[in-house]
């Protein structure tokens, strides 16, 4: 029952989160910083109350290690959200971030000296090809935007290239953070809720450098049209409602993933998250009518088939959690 509940949280929370993020980004494309700040603040306050016990509970992992992890986590979060300001469409944003397997494999080979089977290399090649197809076709769409002069078209394409560079950097940094977390958990034990709190609480002072941009968007949000919230009947600017729902659904999504990691194998978690991304992508395309050609569909299918191949879903479908843990120990 608990794993099924967690899967429900992941699909409901994460899919809804993408919807509200796109509603925010479509109205104010530069709102990435205020969205990131709101998410960090909400999770930090919740963690301070219920995980850190109002600051009375000492951390199991030394703060100096969290400082390193937090620097990486803060950078990844800000860069990923800021990429939406750089002509990156939401579907491409989701597809590109699905390339985390590639980044993990590359850094695993370089840093941890890991070696993989030819089957896994094939699956990663498939994911890479899918991302390349989607990125290339999106580039063509940027360069042929109607109503733009040659100068404006080149400028839009240049910003798009910067957005791709930002997503690539965030992808590699996120993979490096995952390896760092893996070494910490091996040394100090798994403390996922504690890590979640410190990863969101410690970076809060860093938002001082983004205060001007955040304040500008507070003013813009205040000027948005009024919206009456169903059921409770409270009236508020619609952009604040979108932001509130984005923050709440982000928390639900993270909690669902956390429960899954404690109840299921990493294979199951990867499969659920992958399927969730696919559902979010389909909804974004259909509901928001984002441009998506047959080439995009081909690239997307490559990404998701490659991901499923990498996790060896068909091979391990009937394998129990204890058996997988035994296999992990052998490796």
Curated annotation (Swiss-Prot):
Top-level taxon in the UniProt lineage: Eukaryota
InterPro entries assigned to the protein according to its UniProt record, in alphabetical order: SCL35B1-4/HUT1
Subcellular location: Endoplasmic reticulum membrane
Chain ranges passing through the membrane: 4-24, 30-50, 59-79, 92-112, 124-144, 153-173, 201-221, 229-249, 251-267, 268-288, 294-314
Chief localization: endoplasmic reticulum
Bilayer disposition of the protein: Multi-pass membrane protein
One GO biological process term: regulation of gluconeogenesis
Record-annotated disulphide pairs: none
Molecular function per GO: UDP-N-acetylglucosamine transmembrane transporter activity; UDP-xylose transmembrane transporter activity
Annotated catalysed reactions: UDP-N-acetyl-alpha-D-glucosamine(in) + UDP-alpha-D-glucuronate(out) = UDP-N-acetyl-alpha-D-glucosamine(out) + UDP-alpha-D-glucuronate(in); UDP-alpha-D-xylose(in) + UDP-alpha-D-glucuronate(out) = UDP-alpha-D-xylose(out) + UDP-alpha-D-glucuronate(in)
A cellular component annotation (GO) from this entry: Golgi apparatus
Motif (Mediates endoplasmic reticulum retention): 326-331
Keyword Transport: yes
Keywords: Endoplasmic reticulum, Membrane, Sugar transport, Transmembrane, Transmembrane helix, Transport
UniProt key word Transmembrane helix: yes
Functional summary from the UniProt entry: Antiporter that transports nucleotide sugars across the endoplasmic reticulum (ER) membrane in exchange for another nucleotide sugar. May couple UDP-alpha-D-glucuronate (UDP-GlcA) or UDP-alpha-D-xylose (UDP-Xyl) efflux to UDP-alpha-D-glucuronate (UDP-GlcA) influx into the ER lumen, which in turn stimulates glucuronidation and excretion of endobiotics and xenobiotics.
Family that this chain belongs to: Belongs to the nucleotide-sugar transporter family. SLC35B subfamily.
Protein name: Nucleotide sugar transporter SLC35B4
Species for this entry: Mus musculus (Mouse)
Phylogenetic lineage: Eukaryota, Metazoa, Chordata, Craniata, Vertebrata
């Amino acid at each position: 029952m608990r794993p099924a509940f967690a899967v429900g949280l992941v699909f409901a929370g994460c899919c809804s989160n993408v919807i509200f993020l796109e509603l925010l980004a479509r109205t104010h494309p530069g709102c990435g910083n205020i969205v990131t700040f709101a998410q960090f603040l909400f999770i930090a306050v919740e963690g301070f109350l219920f995980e850190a016990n109002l600051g009375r509970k000492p951390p199991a992992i030394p703060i100096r290690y969290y400082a390193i992890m937090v620097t990486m986590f803060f950078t990844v979060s800000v860069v990923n959200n800021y990429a939406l300001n750089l002509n990156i469409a939401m579907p491409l944003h989701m597809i590109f971030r699905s390339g985390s397997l590639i980044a993990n494999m590359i850094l695993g080979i370089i840093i941890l000296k890991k070696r993989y089977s030819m089957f896994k290399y094939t699956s990663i090649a498939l994911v890479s090809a899918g991302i390349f197809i989607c990125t290339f076709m999106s580039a063509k769409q940027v360069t042929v935007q109607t109503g733009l002069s040659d100068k404006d078209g080149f400028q839009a394409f240049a910003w798009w290239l910067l957005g791709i560079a930002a997503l690539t950097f965030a992808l590699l940094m996120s993979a490096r953070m995952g390896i760092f977390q893996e070494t910490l958990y091996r040394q100090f034990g798994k403390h996922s809720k504690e890590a979640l709190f410190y990863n969101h609480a410690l970076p809060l002072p860093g938002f001082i450098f983004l205060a001007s941009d955040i304040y500008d968007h507070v003013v813009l949000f205040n000027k948005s049209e009024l919206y009456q919230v169903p059921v409770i009947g409270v009236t508020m600017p619609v952009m604040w409602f979108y932001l509130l729902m984005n923050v709440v659904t982000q928390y639900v999504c993270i909690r669902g993933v956390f429960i899954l990691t404690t109840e299921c194998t990493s294979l199951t978690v990867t499969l659920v998250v992958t399927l969730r991304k696919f559902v979010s992508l389909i909804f974004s395309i259909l509901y928001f009518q984002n441009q998506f050609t047959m080439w995009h569909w081909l690239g997307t299918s490559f990404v998701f088939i490659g991901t499923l191949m990498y996790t060896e879903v068909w091979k391990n479908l009937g394998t129990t959690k204890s058996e997988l843990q035994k296999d992990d120990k052998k490796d």
